[in-house]
Every structure is written in C-alpha cells, then in structure tokens.
Amino acid sequence: MARIGSFLIILYLIYALTLCICDDDESNYGGDKGNLFPGFYRSSCPRAEEIVRSVVAKAVARETRMAASLMRLHFHDCFVQGCDGSLLLDTSGSIVTEKNSNPNSRSARGFEVVDEIKAALENECPNTVSCADALTLAARDSSVLTGGPSWMVPLGRRDSTSASLSGSNNNIPAPNNTFNTIVTRFNNQGLDLTDVVALSGSHTIGFSRCTSFRQRLYNQSGNGSPDRTLEQSYAANLRQRCPRSGGDQNLSELDINSAGRFDNSYFKNLIENMGLLNSDEVLFSSNEQSRELVKKYAEDQEEFFEQFAESMIKMGNISPLTGSSGEIRKNCRKINNS
C-alpha cells in the first residue's frame, strides 16, 4: 500500500509539471463541438484544473479504485443526453435520477468526490465551472494518477436541467451485450470501432460486481453451461468469488494482473482468454477488426495510450451544452432554483 501511495505521489508531481508546459492551442478543439477548448477558464477561473486535480489526487490516494469509478461516471454521463452532468442529479421535483437505472444502481460511485470538487471550485470561482466540465477533468486526472495517458481537455460545457432514466437504461452498453449491440450503442454516440476497443481499455483499472459476470461462469447461453472461452483456472478463481447464487456485490478485478495501474495489461488478458466481462471477451472473439486492435494495443502500450486519449476527447465532446444552453449548477446534485 505504501508503494502504491508513493507511486501516485510521483505521478501527481510529474503530471502537475506536464500541465504547466503543455500548449493549449484553442484552434484544435472548436468547430461543431460548440467551441470547447482547453483554455476556456483561463481568465474566469485560472486554477480550475489545479483544483480538480488536487481533489482527485487525494481521493485516489485514499482509494485507488476511485479512479476507475470517476472514469465510469464520465462514460455513463456522456452516453445519456451528452456530457452534461445529468447523471449527477438526484431525484427532485420533475427530475428522475439516472442513478437508479440498471447500469448505475448499486454500482455508480464517486458522487461525493464530485461534490468535493464542486465545493472547492465554487469557493474559488462561484458560478463559473460546470459540473460537466469538472467530471470530464476528473476522468482525465484519474487516468494520469494511475499511470495512464494525459490529454488537454476541451472545456466550456454547461450543465443540463434534466435527466433521462430511460436514456440511461437504453443507451449505455451492458456487460452481457453482444458485440453488435455494443458497437451499435457506441455508433449511436458518434464513436467507431476503434473508440470501442480503446475506451474498453479503461477496464485495465477497477472492479466489477459478481452480478455483471455470473452468467459467464454458470449459464452463458441459457443452457446451464459456462462460457467455454474463459481460461479454466481463471474461471475457477472467479467461481470462488462469485457463487451460483448470492454474493451479487462481490468484486473481482477487471484486470487480474494490475487492477490499480493503468496499462495495456487488459488487452494481454483478452488474448489469454482472461477478460472478466462478456463485453470484454467479445472484442477478441467476435470480430476480426477488433481482434487486430486488441493485438496491437497488447503489443504497443504507447499506441493504446495515444488512441485512448484521442477517444476520450471524442467521447467528452458528445452533444455538449454550450453558450446560453443549460446552466452552471451551484450544486451538482440539483438544478439551480429547485
């Protein structure tokens, strides 16, 4: 544990220095994305990124798993109404929270960290930095703080005044989806197969609940048989943690080799038939193009990091609210004047 803490501190210091010397050329991020650009808060809240980074660093130092949780929040937010912070809203008045959808109920976490980020931002720059931008920055910082790539985050999103429970239930890919369903749900958000594989690489960190992979162990095709593509010793280990009944909330690492470090081990696991979720395994077994991408990223971590950063920027640009649309929430859990 002490080694992990020291590793995270070193990464944080390197990361802070890197951000100071990076070029935030606004011309790279405009166009049809509402003129989002990295320097959006340069004048209005110059310490915004520093504040977010500091809070996330403390949270990840307390619990490394939080990095994966924050990245997952960003993913689940962007796939419903775009990256607008709708997932952060609690039920109130006309709002029916997305937190109770099938993909989020009893699994989405990290909301308290977002609250802490927002409180710090409001103290520094009231009514300035959106919850949507704060979550997008937190996802980037979570990558860096666990050893993954960094990227300049286009900023300027505003927060929604609505949520969509049905959108959350229908738009977000599920762990047991088929390959075609997963690709279709990504395509619906303007993301292609390369994005599917690269973004799935975020499963190099974090954990998943037994209920998300039990069917692979006991009833993959509805005939009472396990998924034969699972490596046998790995499957036996998983059955120890995930019984046929009960233990729904028991956790297993998404990456058995390095669940706390962002690297390309996830793709190596897929080649060895040790992907935890069905949605992981199908990337290697169901399509030649995705299989070749898995092999490429398994062989070349730098290639994976570059594509992951590019795909995260692309995902973060899904249907942003900008200009006078939406609002800047004072509290990420509720709309203003509610």
UniProtKB/Swiss-Prot annotation:
Its main location: secreted. This is Peroxidase 15. There are 73 peroxidase genes in A.thaliana. Its cofactor is heme b; Ca(2+). Substrate binds at P173. GO terms for cellular component: extracellular region. The record marks R72 as: Transition state stabilizer. Disulfide bonds join C45-C125, C78-C83, C131-C332, C210-C242. Ca(2+) 1 binds at D77, V80, G82, D84, S86. Coiled coil: none annotated. The keyword Aminoacyl-tRNA synthetase does not apply. Glycans are attached at N176, N219, N250. Heme b binds at H203. Its EC number is 1.11.1.7. CDD domains: secretory_peroxidase. Belongs to the peroxidase family. Classical plant (class III) peroxidase subfamily. Binds 1 heme b (iron(II)-protoporphyrin IX) group per subunit. It catalyses: 2 a phenolic donor + H2O2 = 2 a phenolic radical donor + 2 H2O. Removal of H(2)O(2), oxidation of toxic reductants, biosynthesis and degradation of lignin, suberization, auxin catabolism, response to environmental stresses such as wounding, pathogen attack and oxidative stress. These functions might be dependent on each isozyme/isoform in each plant tissue. GO terms for biological process: hydrogen peroxide catabolic process; response to oxidative stress. Pfam families: peroxidase (PF00141). Residues 1-22 form the signal peptide. The active site is at H76. InterPro entries: Haem_peroxidase, Haem_peroxidase_sf, Peroxidase_pln, Peroxidases_AS, Peroxidases_heam-ligand_BS, Secretory_peroxidase. It is an enzyme of class 1 (oxidoreductase). One of its GO terms (molecular function) is heme binding.
